[in-house]
């Protein structure tokens, strides 16, 4: 076997072209309507590759001078991987004990056991505990001779000459005595109590599951004595409390590995204590509510919608500082009834004038309608009420309304209107008049009188003065300098000081 070795060949096998037909075809010399078959490059390359791979599998190098290499390759492959008739399966023996056992089991020939028939070794021993050896007829005879010298099984003890002595020799006398009053295993009725004086337990076992009741008590001085209940196997067993009335059964409580479910109302006279950070939970509808204590604060928490048994969401409606007891709210508070507080403070903020519109402050949530009155703060008295509030888009101030009033209106008010004017429905009575005295005229008078003369026909009193009288020597011709007038200044009193007024 050899490959193409002239210059017409290539060194790399060309890719095999796609299959043209699924029909098996054969060579033809062109007889009849058939053309002469042309195998083509693919067919020769495939045949050469198959032959060369066969030699490679057998470990034989192609030799152009030898014409039996294909036969030698097939023979070598068979010798390496096949059992030869002439060797009588010696190849398996040579492979070792494990290979021999595997070969037997492949033929369904096993070593004999209690559960499977198969090959077994014989023994004549009568004292062997082995369960893999088979007894010979000799061993069986020895055992039968021994048995014949003993009590016959088919006599069921009838051949025992002294049965009471036999029971006594077996130490069964006390057992027989107890059996007379024993509880039957298939059911019985007790007229008295059942007492366990040791660590015995009461157990129910079904399949691989069990339920047990026991009592732990190491000594009379044991301070950790308790009665225990246990179910077990794969963790799916649990305790169930239920009640039955007539034909109706009602589940009351389930206790599983990780949770106690109370299915009816629970009335607790003592404390309900949770040592988990998350305590009481109410899971109803889409949302869950629970109380959480993280060590520093105690929170009222909510879950996301649709996850009422899940963890808490980002809302913090209310929390209590564990150290100070201070209550904080993170989502606002709506109160329909009265609210009582010793002190009330606003977390105020600073800013520019225009920002006062949005600062934290006490404010009415609803805008005051035009021409409608709204009180923001109110103080109740025995016969009247005082309010801070206003009239929509018109006024804001302090108002008083008597309890006896039936018609709309107020009984007293002092307010600022929408133009910035401050109006008071009655007198403004200051507690200190100093501010008023320094600004307003308290009194007006005529000042000290003086005489001025030399009147002319166009005389005018000095600025801020008035004429109070005339003086003449007899004739009043208002010339010559002998006619005169008396004048006094007009004065005003401001804050205790007299000032002369000026003319316009």
Swiss-Prot record:
Keyword Transmembrane set for record: no
Upregulating conditions: Expressed in the late phase of the viral replicative cycle. Expression of late genes is activated by the viral late transcription activator C. Expressed alternatively with tail fiber protein S' (associated with tail fiber assembly protein U'). The switch from S-U to S'-U' occurs through inversion of a DNA segment called G by the phage invertase protein Gin.
PANTHER family, sorted: PROPHAGE SIDE TAIL FIBER PROTEIN HOMOLOG STFQ-RELATED
Keywords of this entry: Host cytoplasm, Host-virus interaction, Late protein, Viral attachment to host adhesion receptor, Viral attachment to host cell, Viral receptor tropism switching, Viral tail fiber protein, Viral tail protein, Virion, Virus entry into host cell
Function according to Swiss-Prot or TrEMBL: Component of the tail fiber that acts as a receptor binding protein. Binds to the primary receptor, thereby determining the host range. Two alternate tail fiber S and S' proteins are encoded extending the host range of the virus.
UniProt record similarity statement: Belongs to the caudovirales tail fiber protein family.
Organism of provenance: Escherichia phage Mu
The protein's name in its UniProt record: Tail fiber protein S
Regions annotated as coiled coil: none
InterPro entries: Gp34_trimer, Phage_lambda_Stf-r2, Phage_Tail_Fiber_Structural
One GO CC term, this protein: virus tail, fiber
Single biological process term from Gene Ontology: adhesion receptor-mediated virion attachment to host cell
Major localization class: virion
Additional comment: The orientation of the G segment is defined as G+ and G-. G+ orientation provides S-U fibers whereas G- provides S'-U' fibers. S-U and S'-U' dont have the same host range (e.g. respectively E.coli and C.freundii).
Pfam families listed in its UniProt record: Gp34_trimer, Phage_fiber_2
Effect of deleting the gene: Viral particles lack tail fibers in inversion-defective gin mutants (blocked in G+ orientation; no switch to S'-U').
Cellular compartments annotated: Virion; Host cytoplasm
The UniProt record lists the keyword Ribonucleoprotein: no
Superkingdom of origin: Viruses
